[in-house]
């Protein structure tokens, strides 16, 4: 009986901690696009600025292809 109560209290505390940290971190990521580009360049082989590209292939490290060149 005591063990069951301890487990229930522990689960309630862990759930409360997760909810508190989720509310605190809401809206704190300021540069989402920059972070996304950084992940893209680290996870795939990408083309550097000035290299030829196609808009449909998304292979530029910067994430943008303008007039056939990575920019």
From Swiss-Prot:
Residues 23-45 form a propeptide. It is found in: Secreted. InterPro entries: Conotoxin, Conotoxin_omega-typ_CS. The keyword Secreted applies. This is Omega-conotoxin CVIA. Its main location: secreted. GO terms for molecular function: calcium channel inhibitor activity; toxin activity; transmembrane transporter binding. Disulfide bonds join 46-61, 53-65, 60-70. Expressed by the venom duct. SUPFAM superfamilies: omega toxin-like.
